[in-house]
């Protein structure tokens, strides 16, 4: 069985993948995993550190062949506002609930949640069911750089710390003079195969 121990970002010049693997957004945060390719082959992904992969990123097999990561279609909501200001307000409400969101110029895309749909419609949004690949924005605390996930979060250390209930600390920058604990309303599973 071939192994993968390195990767290249999407759009790398002169890259011609010979295989593909489709993964939904929540399965694209990887370090070590047996991957089932679209052509029926299997490869063992074995990276030094966890990586949050995006659509089009490339895995490099031990033999030099490339495997393209494709974002799988998912059941989503497409959210549109009356105008850009309204769309920004809707984005604020979604962010306040810590929801993964793909934010585009004229729409926001989220995973389907009928409670959230009711809230958005109550705020005047148009909400449509769609099925397409999902590439949510990477959170400020959960992706430092294009492909890393710093478990220690040392890059944040600017003082004025507050604690979250999901296993690691985050800190605020200068001018934020408070400490607090709060529940995100969701869980992060930092176990890696």
UniProtKB/Swiss-Prot annotation:
MF annotations from Gene Ontology: nickel cation binding; unfolded protein binding
SUPFAM superfamilies on file: Urease metallochaperone UreE, C-terminal domain, Urease metallochaperone UreE, N-terminal domain
Segments for region (Disordered): 138-193
Comp. bias regions, Basic and acidic residues: 147-193
Record flagged with keyword rRNA-binding: no
Transmembrane feature ranges: none
Chief localisation class: cytoplasm
GO cellular component, one term: cytoplasm
Gene Ontology process terms (BP): protein folding; protein-containing complex assembly; urea metabolic process
InterPro entries named among the record's database cross-references: UreE, UreE_C_dom, UreE_N, UreE_N_sf
Location within or outside the cell: Cytoplasm
Keywords associated with the record: Chaperone, Cytoplasm, Nickel
Keyword field contains Lyase: no
NCBIfam families attached to this UniProt entry: PRK13261.2-6
Function: Involved in urease metallocenter assembly. Binds nickel. Probably functions as a nickel donor during metallocenter assembly.
Protein family per UniProt: Belongs to the UreE family.
This protein's name: Urease accessory protein UreE
Organism: Rhizobium leguminosarum bv. trifolii (strain WSM2304)
Gene name, Swiss-Prot/TrEMBL: ureE
């Amino acid at each position: 069985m071939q192994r993968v121990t390195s990767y290249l970002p999407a759009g790398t010049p002169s890259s011609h993948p010979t295989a593909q693997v489709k993964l939904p957004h929540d399965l694209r945060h990887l370090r070590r995993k047996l991957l089932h390719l679209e052509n029926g082959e299997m490869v063992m992904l074995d990276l030094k550190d966890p990586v949050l992969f995006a659509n089009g990123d490339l895995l490099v097999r031990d033999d030099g062949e490339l495997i393209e990561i494709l974002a799988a279609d998912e059941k989503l909501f497409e959210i549109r506002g009356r105008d850009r200001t309204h769309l920004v307000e809707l984005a604020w409400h979604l962010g306040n609930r810590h929801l993964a969101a793909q934010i585009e110029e004229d729409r926001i895309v989220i995973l389907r949640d009928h409670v959230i749909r009711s809230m958005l419609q109550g705020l005047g949004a148009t909400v449509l069911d769609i099925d397409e690949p999902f590439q949510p924005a990477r959170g400020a605390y959960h992706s430092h750089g294009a492909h890393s996930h710093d478990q220690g979060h040392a890059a944040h250390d600017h003082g004025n710390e507050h604690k979250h209930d999901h296993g690691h600390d985050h800190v605020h920058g200068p001018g934020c003079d408070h400490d607090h604990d709060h529940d995100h309303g969701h869980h992060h599973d930092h176990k890696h195969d």
